[in-house]
A protein has these predicted regions:
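Outer-membrane beta-barrel channels and translocator barrels
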Residues: 37, 72-76, 115-119, 161-164, ...
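Residues that define the transmembrane beta-barrel architecture of outer-membrane proteins
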Residues: 38-40, 59-63, 100-106, 120, ...
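Residue-level detector of the transmembrane beta-barrel scaffold of outer-membrane proteins
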Residues: 41-45, 78-82, 121-125, 165-167, ...
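Predominantly the C-terminal beta-signal and adjacent terminal strand-loop region
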Residues: 82-94, 153-195
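Gram-negative bacterial Sec-dependent N-terminal signal peptides
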Residues: 1-19
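Flexible, solvent-exposed loop segments that connect beta-strands
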Residues: 27, 48-58, 84-103, 132-149, ...
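Surface-exposed, polar helix/loop patches in the mature regions of secreted/periplasmic/lumenal proteins
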Residues: 111-145
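Short glycine/proline- and aromatic-enriched beta-strand/turn motifs that initiate or cap beta-hairpins
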Residues: 19-71, 110, 128, 132, ...
Length: 195
């Protein structure tokens, strides 16, 4: 009877060790990218944008893409940089008038991984930076446009899984008119390289 119990215990230990080895190899790439200290992670985010408040009166829904860079500084905190372009559909606040505000965000920030130590799971993010706001209006046959560079801030939450992430953000594209330039974005991202 002792031989059976001993054999069963050895088999269970070996099976557990083999299973742990399989779990490590199945996430080999994500662990290598996520746990490397001071490694720059490069990716791309695609998002859908919905303007709020009075910003929604002159700007339609939009979509965009951003190049992302993440630099881990300590176990749960990374510095981030994101830059890209956001295209918005026309909005007609008055009959015969079409307006939109495209933007080029250049943002610096930080990302805090809440529950995990290997840069996986729930995270919170905060960003600040410049928004190049390209406003265009068409009235009848006449059109006009202007560019304004504004300072803005944002915050968001998301979830990181291997190289993929999903996040929801709220940004103010203009700190001078904080409540009048709010934008909610949601999207997915993929980290494709690490240096």
């Amino acid at each position: 009877m002792n031989k059976v119990i001993t054999t069963a215990a050895v088999i269970l230990c070996l099976a557990g060790a083999a299973n742990a080895g399989d779990a490590r190899t199945s996430h080999n790439r994500s662990t290598a990218m996520a746990s490397s200290a001071h490694q720059i992670l490069v990716g791309v985010d695609a998002d859908f944008a919905l303007p709020l408040s009075t910003y929604g009166d002159i700007n339609g829904p939009g979509a965009g893409a951003l190049l992302t860079i993440e630099y881990p500084v300590i176990e749960q905190v990374s510095l981030t940089a994101r830059a890209g372009f956001q295209y918005h559909l026309d909005k007609s606040p008055v009959a015969g008038v079409d307006t939109h505000v495209h933007s080029i965000p250049v943002l610096l920030g930080a990302k805090y991984y809440v529950m995990q130590s290997d840069r996986q799971g729930l995270f919170a993010a905060a960003e600040l930076g410049m928004f190049d706001l390209m406003t265009s209006a068409t009235i009848g046959g006449a059109s006009g446009s202007s560019n304004n560079v504004k300072f803005g801030v944002g915050a968001g939450v998301g979830y990181q899984w291997n190289q993929w992430n999903a996040r929801v953000n709220i940004h103010s594209h203009d700190m001078g008119s904080f409540g009048d330039a709010l934008m909610v974005t949601g999207g997915i991202g993929y980290q494709f390289a690490g240096f």
